[in-house]
């Protein structure tokens, strides 16, 4: 590699990091209320529906039985700030997470395609997009995981608070479980993130490629032979929306298991239902089996609706903001 290429590649990496961090921060803050509700559903052992046919009264009465009911409950008991519970560690997680993810993704695609131009990356095999997304997701997860753990704990604790802030939760985990405690649940998280990130980025590239093909066809037939394939912001939004929905729906059971591992041993108020004691689950397979046996198959999909309502626009916002911020900063910095 020539010395002249190194500054350009460094600028490209900085552009990807900054664009990824900004898009992740905006997406996370906008969708925080739905994320809090989703987490409350996922860590509730009791049924999350009032439909009798789906109920399995193994643990007792349910705290949350629907999106609207949960919204009213959180608003009444915790006020508006309750919907942004855990948002600070979430930002500390999402901003470096998306920064690392998009940077690694661009590096991998540049290596595979032999070009740093984003347009050339769309010519890659869809399988390479999936693999690149999975590797980028794993790298980003390892780099930001402690904040993911703190976010889940703070978002799920309710009132009265077990931990008043992120600092107190961090110190308590270090004291009681050591540094390794900050990585509780990392293994199931990596098992989840590999298919999730792969599907998210792979499907986004696939949808975007299809949209460009449609644009070429449309303009060549309707616009006097023009073959403009540029993708509009609304089309980018649709691609991100579809990618977020598809990837989250496919991997939701693994996300439920991940959340259960993350809050093992958390002493919440009894009104939030049966606690998840330490060592309740001996591994991912055991957790999946226990959830199905005690909560039914529906237990693996607790929080799916708020998760989809959140993930679809979150994915759309992330990709649209990233594309625009990346292009804008890239133009200012003279980076292709």
From Swiss-Prot:
Keyword Transport: yes
Main location: mitochondrion
InterPro entries: Mit_carrier, Mitochondrial_sb/sol_carrier, Mt_carrier_dom_sf
Keywords: Membrane, Mitochondrion, Mitochondrion inner membrane, Repeat, Transmembrane, Transmembrane helix, Transport
Biological process, per Gene Ontology: thiamine pyrophosphate transmembrane transport
Solcar repeats: 11-111, 124-210, 231-328
Cell location: Mitochondrion inner membrane
Disulfide topology: none
Gene3D superfamilies: Mitochondrial carrier domain (1.50.40.10)
Record's bilayer topology term: Multi-pass membrane protein
Coiled coil regions in record: none
Key word Nucleotide-binding present: no
An example Gene Ontology molecular-function term: thiamine pyrophosphate transmembrane transporter activity
Listed GO CC annotations: mitochondrial inner membrane; mitochondrion
Transmembrane segments: 11-27, 88-105, 127-150, 182-199, 230-246, 303-322
Tissues/organs with expression: Ubiquitous with highest expression in pollen.
Chain's role: Mitochondrial transporter that mediates uptake of thiamine diphosphate (ThDP) into mitochondria.
Family of this protein: Belongs to the mitochondrial carrier (TC 2.A.29) family.
Entry protein name: Mitochondrial thiamine diphosphate carrier 1
Protein source organism: Zea mays (Maize)
């Amino acid at each position: 590699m020539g010395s002249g290429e190194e500054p350009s590649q460094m600028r490209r990496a900085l552009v990807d990091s900054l664009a990824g961090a900004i898009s992740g921060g905006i997406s996370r803050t906008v969708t925080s209320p739905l994320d809090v509700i989703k987490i409350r559903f996922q860590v509730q052992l009791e049924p999350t529906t009032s439909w009798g046919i789906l109920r399995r009264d193994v643990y007792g009465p349910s705290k949350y039985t629907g999106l609207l009911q949960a919204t009213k409950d959180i608003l009444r008991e915790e006020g508006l700030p309750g919907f942004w519970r855990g948002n600070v560690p979430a930002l500390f997680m999402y901003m470096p997470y998306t920064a690392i993810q998009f940077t690694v993704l661009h590096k991998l695609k540049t290596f595979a395609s032999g070009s740093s131009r984003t347009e050339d990356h769309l010519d890659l095999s869809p399988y390479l997009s999936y693999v690149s997304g999975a590797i980028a997701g794993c790298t980003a997860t390892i780099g930001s995981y402690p904040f993911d753990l703190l976010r889940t704990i703070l978002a799920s604790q309710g009132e009265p608070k077990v931990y008043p802030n992120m600092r107190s939760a961090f110190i308590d985990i270090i004291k009681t479980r050591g540094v390794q405690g900050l990585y509780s649940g990392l293994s199931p998280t990596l098992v989840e993130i590999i298919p999730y990130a792969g599907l998210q980025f792979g499907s986004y590239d696939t949808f975007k490629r299809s949209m460009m093909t449609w644009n070429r066809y449309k303009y060549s037939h309707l616009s006097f032979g023009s073959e403009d394939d540029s993708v509009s912001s609304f089309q980018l939004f649709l691609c991100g929306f579809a990618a977020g929905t598809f990837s989250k729906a496919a991997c939701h059971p693994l996300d439920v298991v991940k959340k259960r591992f993350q809050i093992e041993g958390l002493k919440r108020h009894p009104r939030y239902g049966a606690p998840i004691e330490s060592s309740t689950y001996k591994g991912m397979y055991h957790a999946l089996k226990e959830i199905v046996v005690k909560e039914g198959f529906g237990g693996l999909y607790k929080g799916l609706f708020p998760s989809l309502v959140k993930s679809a626009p979150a994915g759309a916002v992330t990709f649209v903001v990233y594309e625009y911020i990346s292009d804008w900063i890239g133009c200012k910095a003279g980076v292709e």
